[in-house]
């Protein structure tokens, strides 16, 4: 048994867990390197979270053709459920629900994980995307808000949690606070493309178009290339 950089226990070798840590770091940056690092983590059959991350990546693509890839990943698990830690079993339940077409149920399972393990960044990030896909504005805010107490500014990835919270605030029409938190997020990590996305939303929703254009132009090198969100953020820039 090992522990990740946020102190969460999990099965797998220290080397595989280090790969998983790097994969999650790429995930919150929307970087393509997440795919290879997740595969590296999953190459250790005992690192169940690596396999689950691969399943989540397939599911988050929202392509029907990738649902089978997610199912195949779970089918290939060589460790039985009894060999999993409770948090890992909960992730398996969430992924299985999503594969079965119950995205809301998957989101609820991930919410339960986040309540018990608020520093589970994978549960927060994947759950946040489910809230986005399903249009659950309130939980876009509250899923992250409930976990904030467990994080501090000393945590290297705290800024990315702030970026998610900023988007949740914006979707609940709390524009001033959203912009404030979002700006803190992108100041902490210039490549926080989701945080950038949150801030530009606040400008759009308040009709502050010149401010939004200036913001996106000033940070263009941070969001325009090297991430999965660049086309979406380009669309916001065009707006």
Residue ranges and their predicted role:
Residues 50-51, 123, 161, 195, ...:
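TPR alpha-solenoid repeat register
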Residues 15, 47, 86-87, 120, ...:
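Residues that mark the junctions of alpha-helical repeat units in TPR/alpha-solenoid scaffolds
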Residues 82-178:
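Well-ordered mid-protein domain cores that form the structural environment of catalytic cofactors
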Residues 35-38, 71-75, 107-111, 137-148, ...:
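Hydrophobic core segments within long, regular secondary-structure runs in both alpha-
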Residues 3, 12-13, 17, 22-46, ...:
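Inter-helical turn/loop elements of alpha-helical hairpins
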Residues 202-239:
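Long, internal scaffold/assembly segments composed of regular secondary structure
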Residues 39-45, 78-83, 111-118, 146-155, ...:
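Solenoid-like repeat scaffolds
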Residues 53, 126, 164, 198-199, ...:
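Canonical tetratricopeptide repeat
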């Amino acid at each position: 048994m090992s522990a990740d950089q946020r102190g969460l226990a999990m099965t797998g070798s220290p080397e595989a867990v280090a790969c998983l840590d790097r994969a999650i770091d790429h995930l919150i940056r929307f970087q393509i390197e997440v795919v290879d690092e997740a595969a590296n983590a999953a190459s250790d059959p005992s690192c169940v979270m690596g396999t689950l991350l691969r399943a989540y990546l397939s599911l988050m693509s929202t392509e029907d053709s990738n649902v089978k890839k997610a199912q195949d990943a779970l089918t290939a698990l060589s460790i039985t459920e009894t060999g999993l830690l409770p948090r890992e079993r909960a992730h398996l339940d969430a992924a299985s629900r999503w594969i079965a077409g119950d995205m809301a149920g998957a989101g609820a399972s991930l919410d339960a994980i986040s309540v018990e393990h608020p520093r589970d960044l994978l549960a927060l990030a994947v759950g946040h995307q489910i809230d986005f896909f399903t249009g659950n504005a309130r939980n876009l805010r509250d899923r992250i808000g409930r976990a904030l107490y467990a994080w501090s500014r000393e945590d290297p990835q705290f800024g990315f949690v702030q970026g998610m919270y900023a988007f949740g605030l914006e979707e609940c029409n709390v524009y001033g606070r959203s912009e404030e938190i979002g700006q803190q997020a992108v100041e902490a990590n210039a490549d926080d493309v989701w945080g950038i996305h949150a801030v530009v939303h606040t400008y759009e929703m308040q009709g502050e178009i010149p401010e939004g254009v200036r913001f996106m132009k000033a940070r263009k090198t941070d969001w325009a290339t090297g991430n999965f969100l660049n086309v979406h953020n380009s669309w916001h820039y065009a707006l």
